[in-house]
């Protein structure tokens, strides 16, 4: 059974925040991110199963053969797995922060991916509503509940050379939903891109470019970075 982390923390296992970029190989010319040899899209058709609540997901869910399919990115409501819901000034569930209803729909996604076992491997979710749990080869990697935040996980220690299994469980509501009471339709699922980033062991993680105007009227451009090695 998956332990509900939503009432305890906003995230677990996430990489520290960084500026947004997709790395390219040293010999590559920069371009669209899909052209990078270090970018692997996981968009497409995933295996899928809908549950009425998190507790309905069994102990061996990471080895389960899921009966349905769903495109990623998308929202589950468009495929009949949950009802469309619109609210503006009222909450879409009983107000009792940080708690949400026990009968809180949960959606299990799964797919396989290949890894070469070289360097470091990261997985990036650009948007999941509302919270989600990620497992690689049956092992818990992490959790995030800020729907529109990019969530990046280092999965190097969880993968093996060859085929690997990825399982993601998404809940409709979480504690973070109390901060998202906006005038909008309520949609659920992996609604933005998912991809892998392949990096060498030593690499730039984060950077900052800072322009400065000097007293003599000239300017300088400073480059700060975290991490090192091949960019």
Locate the predicted segments by residue.
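Beta-strand-rich binding/interaction modules
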Residues: 121, 134-136, 217-231
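A short, compositionally biased
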Residues: 41-44, 128, 228-230
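Accessory beta-strand-rich segments of carbohydrate-active enzymes
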Residues: 1-12, 28, 32-33, 47-51, ...
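Accessory carbohydrate-binding/adhesion or oligomerization-edge regions at the termini
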Residues: 1-88, 169, 196
């Amino acid at each position: 059974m998956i332990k509900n982390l939503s009432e305890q923390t906003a995230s677990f296992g996430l990489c520290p925040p960084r500026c947004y970029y997709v790395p390219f190989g040293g010999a590559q010319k920069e371009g669209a991110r899909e052209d990078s040899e270090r970018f692997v899209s996981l968009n497409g058709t995933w295996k899928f199963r809908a549950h009425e609540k998190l507790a309905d997901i069994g102990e061996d869910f990471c080895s389960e053969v899921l009966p349905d399919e769903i495109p990623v990115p998308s929202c589950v409501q468009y495929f009949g797995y949950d009802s469309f819901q619109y609210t503006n000034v009222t909450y879409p569930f009983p107000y009792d922060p940080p708690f949400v209803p026990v009968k809180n729909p949960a959606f299990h996604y799964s797919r396989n991916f290949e890894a070469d076992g070289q360097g470091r491997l990261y997985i990036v979710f650009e948007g999941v509503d509302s919270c989600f749990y990620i497992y690689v080869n049956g092992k818990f990697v992490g959790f995030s509940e800020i729907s529109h935040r990019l969530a990046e996980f280092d999965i190097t220690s969880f993968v093996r050379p060859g085929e690997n299994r990825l399982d993601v469980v998404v809940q409709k509501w979480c504690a973070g939903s109390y901060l998202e009471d906006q005038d909008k339709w309520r949609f659920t699922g992996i609604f933005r891109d998912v991809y892998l980033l392949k990096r060498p062991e030593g690499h730039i993680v984060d950077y900052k470019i800072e322009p400065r105007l000097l007293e003599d009227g000239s300017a300088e451009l400073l480059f700060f970075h975290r991490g090192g090695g091949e960019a």
